[in-house]
């Protein structure tokens, strides 16, 4: 059962959670989509304090001709250490919680143009913001719907040229939908 805190909030008494989401992110020049799989460990289940490790793979659906050759694709392979504080709310007997998080991501990316040129690079640090709802579907299963913002505040490209690794300095906004499964108690 969810554990009650001194603030009257609720949290699942599950130390481990596995997640899989489908992500839609875009900025002025690039629209991306892809999947994220994650593992979260709750240090304090009562207050929703946990650390999360995720792997994210995105590919662009379109690119602007102003910043990239037509047909450019952007593949992002990410390993994302993530720390997050979760806030839980109980409503009308249907358990869900609101969550907000701040994390630092380190990822590698490769860009392949329509003429076969490729470049690779490393971008860090990246700040990831998330705010969403997790609805309880069954005892340990949750449906996650989240708004996401990813900001690349410093890019270094070790490959093809010295342009920013991602268009518009790598700032993306969008949303995710997926499932999370709790393990443990």
Mark where each language-model region is:
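Alpha-helical scaffolds that organize eukaryotic protein assemblies
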Residues: 144, 156, 168-174
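Gram-negative (and chloroplast) outer-membrane scaffold detector with strong preference
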Residues: 40-127, 135-141, 173-185
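Transmembrane beta-strand segments of Gram-negative outer membrane beta-barrel proteins
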Residues: 7-24, 98-102, 172-175
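Primarily recognizes Gram-negative and organellar outer-membrane beta-barrels
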Residues: 6-10, 58-65, 115-117, 156-168
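Internal, hydrophobic beta-strand segments that form the core of beta-sheet-rich folds
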Residues: 146-149
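Outer-membrane beta-barrel biogenesis signature
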Residues: 1-19, 87, 91-95, 183-185
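Solvent-exposed loop/turn segments connecting transmembrane beta-strands
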Residues: 23-34, 92
């Amino acid at each position: 059962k969810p554990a009650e805190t001194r603030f009257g909030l609720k949290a699942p008494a599950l130390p481990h959670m596995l997640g899989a989401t489908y992500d839609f992110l875009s900025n002025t020049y690039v629209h991306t989509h892809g999947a994220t799989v994650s593992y979260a460990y709750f240090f304090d289940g009562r207050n929703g304090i946990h650390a999360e490790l995720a792997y994210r793979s995105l590919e662009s659906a379109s690119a602007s001709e102003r910043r990239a050759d037509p047909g450019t694709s952007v593949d992002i392979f990410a390993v994302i250490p993530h720390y997050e504080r979760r806030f839980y709310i109980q409503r009308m007997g249907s358990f869900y919680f609101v969550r907000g998080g701040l994390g630092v991501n380190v990822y590698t990316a490769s860009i392949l143009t329509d003429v076969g040129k490729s470049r690779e690079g490393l971008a860090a640090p990246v700040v990831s913001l998330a705010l969403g709802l997790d609805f309880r579907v069954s005892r340990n299963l949750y449906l996650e719907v989240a708004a996401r913002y990813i900001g690349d505040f410093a890019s270094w490209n070790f490959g093809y040229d010295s342009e920013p690794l991602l268009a518009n300095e790598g700032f993306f906004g969008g949303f995710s939908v997926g499932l999370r499964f709790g393990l443990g108690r």
